[in-house]
Regions:
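Oxyanion-hole/transition-state-stabilizing segment in secreted/luminal serine hydrolases
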Residues: 48-83, 106-109
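Substrate-gating cap/lid alpha-helix
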Residues: 111-152
């Protein structure tokens, strides 16, 4: 059977959806009828994904990579995060499958007041975090173009469903709920099948 390798952080996991198998990776595996090798975990960073690659299969038909947000929240520079994402995607090339890389979403929908309140940041720190988020997402899009990877712009996909919206897609500030996971899985499916 064909293999789907999921790498990364809580964007992909089932835990916050309230439904067994509700995470984006689980939903995509079912939609595509692929065997899921799930190496995602809550709080994972790009450094963690590099380590996880040692457990990856030698081939995969589909790979999704959701990483960078926890690095960003941990104070890492976009340049350092992008360097590790470049290393990861380079190491994924021999697997031979279609790889989907993802931008980092913004649960505040661009509202710095929400970022300050929910993350306990000063105004200056919030502005700096947004600058770093924009730089990271721009770098992820560039990496996808340069490597010929599929790009899922999760920042755009999730915009309008932030914490203050009538239909928020997040719990515990940054974690995707079932609606978010479903939208992400559908977006990945569309990218992979169009």
């Amino acid at each position: 059977m064909a293999i789907y390798l999921a790498l990364g952080d809580s964007i992909s996991i089932d835990d916050y959806t309230g439904v067994p198998g509700g995470g984006a990776a689980s939903q995509l595996a079912r939609k595509l009828g692929l065997d899921l090798v799930d190496l995602t975990r809550d709080g994972n960073t790009t450094q963690g994904v590099l380590a996880d690659l040692a457990r990856a299969p030698t081939s995969a038909d589909v790979v999704t990579l959701t990483a960078g947000g926890n690095d960003l929240l941990g104070g890492e520079s976009p340049r350092a995060i992008l360097r590790r994402l470049d290393q990861i995607t380079h190491r994924l090339q021999p697997l031979g499958g279609h790889t989907v890389v993802n931008t980092v979403y913004d649960p505040s929908d661009g509202d710095n007041a929400i970022g300050r309140r929910e993350l306990g940041l000063s105004r200056l720190a919030t502005v700096e975090l947004r600058r770093r988020l924009n730089a990271l997402n721009g770098g992820i899009a560039k990496l996808a173009r340069e490597r010929g990877l599929l790009l899922a712009d999760l920042e755009r996909l999730c915009h309008g469903h932030g914490l203050a919206s009538d239909e928020p897609w997040f719990v515990q500030v940054i974690e995707p709920n079932l609606a978010a996971a479903t939208a992400i899985a559908e977006h990945w499916h569309e990218l992979l099948t169009s």
